[in-house]
Amino acid sequence: VEECALVLNPIVKEITLHFENRRDYTIIGWFICGLGAIFYSYEYLLRIAPSVMEHALREHFNLSATGFGLLSSIYYFAYVPMQLPVGVLLDRYGPRRLLTIACLICVVGTFMFTAATVFWIAAAGRFLVGFGSAFAFVGVLKLATIWLPENRLAMVSGMTSALGPIGAMLGDNFMEIFVERLGWIKTMNLTALFGVGLTFILWFGIHDKKGQHRQSGTVSSFKKGMIDLGIIIRSKQIWVNGMYGCLVYLPTTVFAELWGIPYLKHAHGLSAQAAGLANSLLFLGFIIGAPLMGYISDKLFRRKFPMLIGAAGAAIVMMMILYLPGLSESNIQSLMFLLGLLYSAQAIVFAVGRELSPGEAAGTAMAVTNMIVMLGAMFLQPLVGHLLDFSLSAHLGSAAVTGATIDNLQRLYTVDDYQFALSIIPLGILIAAILTFFLKETHAHAPK
């Protein structure tokens, strides 16, 4: 490690000085933000991994749908509350050291998860992964506020939001193949080894400073950061904005990240690979739509209008996916892609959160917004599993469900069971559309 540092540090410093002397930070800024975004994609891959290996995990740990939903959502029991200190810590200490340590924690958690033979050890591993992942998204946004132009904040947040689902697409399309050939344990161990290399890359590649000065987003006093946190978390507009983001993001946090592939396999009869492809098309739609929505919002100097249109359209498409009978595979793929395009308006909430808050608390504002956004996954992933089990028990009887094996349980779920459990998604998106009428229009300007 010391030898690598001796070789790499002078190179990185020379490149940085070259750009500093030219006062042209844009290229190196994109490079640094790109490294952070790779970590965000990596943690996203770890986040959605249980959906790809649902059958293997339920069999290995003997889990009901409720238990499987709980195992996945434990990630968020660390991720969500950590958003409160993450913003303050990033403002205080900078992204470089925190993103590096966070990536290492994700690696340790993944190895713990694969070594587990009982539920609570696996849950502890998922908790650690969630803890480390909590720094990724907001860390990239913090780097963007340091290195990239402020007048393109919505587009930058959209592009950042889009980069995470790239990890999900890799998981849906390639992890399934590795799981079938190597098993879930070896697959996750390989993923953890990649994280070891990424940890070193983050340490040597990321810089917290632009030129010789910290940006105004960096707070010198931890006490000041806590005061800012208190102001932000008491803001009604921050909560309205965050709840919009939470509800319109349910197609990702509840559907695509966990229950989408099982639903498409059981309700529409798709193969594992076809369901993975359809699921990845939702992420592809989001990847394309998030920066596009941000760009349109920046150009119009309006936040609420694209947020309203995106939510209303996403609710309609989600209902079509859930309730239209006889959809062909190509129909499902097209609808999933369209759904991703529409609900990508969610990415705008991070620009709004920044614009509703003072500049020196940029990291804190975006972290609080991200915390609220992720509340949906924390509570609704296990709720969908519970509703599935409840619906199954209602028409089969609890005794039959209790005595069934995991294999039999998965075959016993009906389309009605899934529709009942997943109905919370279109309902939530419709509520998000209504919330836009209570949100202040910032006109793409942060307070002075």
Where do the model's predicted regions map?
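C-terminal ends and interior cores of transmembrane alpha-helices
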Residues: 104-117, 312-326
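Cytoplasmic helix-loop-helix junction between adjacent transmembrane helices
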Residues: 125-164
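Helix-breaking motifs and short loop linkers at transmembrane-helix boundaries and internal kinks
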Residues: 62, 94, 115-121, 149, ...
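Juxtamembrane intracellular "pre-TM" segments in multi-pass secondary transporters
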Residues: 18-25, 209-242
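Helix-loop-helix hairpin linking two adjacent transmembrane segments in secondary transporters
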Residues: 160-208
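Conserved MFS/SLC helix-loop-helix module at the cytosolic interface between two early adjacent transmembrane helices
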Residues: 81-120
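Cytoplasmic membrane-interface "Motif A"-like loop-to-helix N-cap segments
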Residues: 92-103, 298-312
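Extracytoplasmic gate region of multi-pass secondary transporters
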Residues: 50-52, 235-291, 377-388
